[in-house]
A protein has these predicted regions:
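A short, N-terminal "cap"/entry segment at the start of jelly-roll beta-barrel domains
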Residues: 1-35, 121-136
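Active-site region of the double-stranded beta-helix
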Residues: 19-58
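Short, charged/polar surface micro-motifs in flexible loops or helix N-caps
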Residues: 30-34, 43-47, 66-68, 90, ...
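Ligand-binding loop in jelly-roll beta-barrel domains
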Residues: 32, 88-118
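Hydrophobic/aromatic beta-strand elements that line small-molecule binding cavities or substrate pockets
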Residues: 39-41, 82, 92
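A short beta-strand-loop-beta hairpin characteristic of the jelly-roll/cupin
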Residues: 48, 54-80, 90-93
Length: 136
């Protein structure tokens, strides 16, 4: 069994002003896990994950400090240490409503999603990271 500090994983910046940091922890392309993808998102104070849709995957989203979850234009206040659910094909976004704390989102995608956007480059860097850790 391997243990990794999540903050050591490589990240990619997504979004604009302010950006959020995305770390890909588990995926078919990195760990060989075929059933799901697991992503960590760090959303800065006042940041947002801009509305987006996953056509092929359901997404379960854990909010560490709470925030706001919007799905199909319906707004939900999310309490600390809560879980939100976005079925595949639904437009959704996560919002950090604090002024001074980073919102950490743990996102579970079932089934695993196909890489898009910045993910292929992030997959390459994540594989390098895992390989170096396994050599130690």
């Amino acid at each position: 069994m391997k243990v990794f500090n999540l903050k050591d994983f490589p990240f990619a910046e997504f979004g604009e002003n302010p950006t959020r940091l995305i770390r890909l922890l588990v995926s078919p392309q990195t760990t060989g896990e075929q059933r799901c993808s697991i992503v960590i998102g760090s959303v800065p104070p006042g940041g947002i994950s801009e509305g987006h849709v996953h056509q092929e995957s359901d997404e379960y989203i854990y909010f560490d400090i709470g925030g706001r979850f919007v799905i199909n234009k319906k707004v939900f206040e999310v309490k600390e240490k809560s879980l939100a659910f976005a079925p595949k094909g639904t437009i959704h976004e996560c919002i950090n409503i604090t002024k001074d704390k980073v919102l950490t989102l743990v996102c579970f995608f079932l089934p695993a999603f196909e890489p898009y956007g910045k993910y292929p480059e992030l997959i390459e860097r994540t594989n390098e990271f895992i390989k170096k850790k396994e050599e130690k």
